[in-house]
Amino acid sequence: MADEEIAALVIDNGSGMCKAGFAGDDAPRAVFPSIVGRPRHQGVMVGMGQKDSYVGDEAQSKRGILTLKYPIEHGIVTNWDDMEKIWHHTFYNELRVAPEEHPVLLTEAPLNPKANREKMTQIMFETFNTPAMYVAIQAVLSLYASGRTTGIVMDSGDGVTHTVPIYEGYALPHAILRLDLAGRDLTDYLMKILTERGYSFTTTAEREIVRDIKEKLCYVALDFEQEMATAASSSSLEKSYELPDGQVITIGNERFRCPEALFQPSFLGMESCGIHETTFNSIMKCDVDIRKDLYANTVLSGGTTMYPGIADRMQKEITALAPSTMKIKIIAPPERKYSVWIGGSILASLSTFQQMWISKQEYDESGPSIVHRKCF
């Protein structure tokens, strides 16, 4: 395959998972946790080939002896040295490519500080010597993946949730809303409410166990109060989970209390609106003429929208907020966990997109600020 040589790379750097692969593919080749782990103890056995840091799945599998750190918090890179390690791992270990031979499409959350994308640009050109790169907004890519050009995307990942109205392919920046409440906060909340049940989860490694419980057993209730009553009166909602050491724990109303925080952030002690209200507020910030199209094309994307029951609940909540005659449609594609990456794969392989890349030459002439002019 001669094209493989120049295929663009698409890297969706999430706060929780990094999704990477080649433009034109229908799914990412590599999906691994955005984690860098460092040993908690001194190595005592010489010749074991111990490293001073581990990335991704390897960090995850050795988590018992490591301190795990996520370099991306709420969609913003907070530790650039670790971020470089993740990119290095992506290119050389996961995709096994030479970054100086491929254009690279990166993604970022909307309303990110400008310095964040400048630094991304700088590292790609100066550290990895990529021939060309581009930074795209995550939610816009999700809409591409759903085959639409108009709609509102409610994208919720591990670090940040945002609602982005898009009309005829243009994101409407004044109406984008961002909520720093996402998967990681729900994991922390589940750790807290499991502690109330008498199970103790405290370390960074144990947090990963709780994340797994959350992903396997949690769901969104259509009617929270009613579900609480059901849970109190019978054990029909209880499920058990086996911990790595063989101990079995039982989880009941925590299953839906945890993701309920998306609709009631007050559970986490936050004063913000829930995801349904944020979506509604975002639509209300748009021109009155286009709202109908947004209500009818509300697209969910990101891993935190994977809970069973979330689409029905969104439908119910937004119907309650919107005018009574409005047609409301919540679109929850089955592949929405990866729809940002899929959208990036579509975008980077379009012939019309090829003139959009920032080239190494343009970067050398203008410096990192070129990214604001070419990527919008």
Curated annotation (Swiss-Prot):
PROSITE patterns: ACTINS_1, ACTINS_2, ACTINS_ACT_LIKE. Its EC number is 3.6.4.-. One of its GO terms (molecular function) is hydrolase activity. The keyword Ribonucleoprotein does not apply. It comes from the Eukaryota. Keywords: ATP-binding, Cytoplasm, Cytoskeleton, Hydrolase, Nucleotide-binding, Oxidation. GO terms for biological process: axonogenesis; cell motility. It is an enzyme of class 3 (hydrolase). SUPFAM superfamilies: Actin-like ATPase domain (SSF53067). The modification Methionine (R)-sulfoxide is found at M45, M48. Pfam families: Actin (PF00022). One of its GO terms (cellular component) is focal adhesion. It is found in: Cytoplasm, Cytoskeleton. Polymerization of globular actin (G-actin) leads to a structural filament (F-actin) in the form of a two-stranded helix. Each actin can bind to 4 others. Belongs to the actin family. This is Actin, cytoplasmic type 5.
